[in-house]
Amino acid sequence: GDGIAAVIVEPVAGNMGCVLPVDGFLETLRRETEKHGTVLIFDEVMCGFRTELHGAQGKYGIIPDMTCLGKIIGGGLPAAAYGGKRDIMNRIAPDGSVYQAGTLSGNPLAVTAGLETLQMIRTIPDFYKILEEKTKRLLDGWLDAAAEAGVAVQVHQSGSMFCLFFNDKPVLNYEDSCACDGKKFKAWFLSMLEQGIYLAPSPFETLFMS
């Protein structure tokens, strides 16, 4: 109602493993926020440009009122950005009364690196299709290895974002992620490390194909 100014959500969660939105979740958020005049903000710091060129909002077809993006827009250099619909962004100075600035805003090196990265992405034919196929090939290999070892796993993927859960049930939220087998993850992590493959040391981290 009138007491809720904004709803902010990761359209693809990235800090409890890679947890995908269930069917209808984002659509319901969009419908209800529009109904009550509440601003819908997508935190695409992790999924922006990783799920596809237009981020998770492009992949799932849900357009928020505002979007937050992280260092991926700097081509790996420290950078961040936010944007939104005209009526919201017009409130930012100098057009509006909300002042936002900093000594690192618009850093030339980070902005140049980010621009070059985005131009490369747009010019490489089938860039995201290739990236997604590479990710799927890796996950298919993990599934085959797990089946051969008799270990129950779930793999999640959205574009180039992915992770593996040691669980025999679907992982739909934080509680499901916490219920996964941490001992099996630790054994898997150490086994991979012994083979010269360094992964994030936490089951709550999302991995990215490059």
Task: Annotate each predicted stretch with a short phrase.
Residues 1-210:
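Conserved N-terminal phosphate-binding loop of PLP-dependent enzymes in the Aspartate aminotransferase
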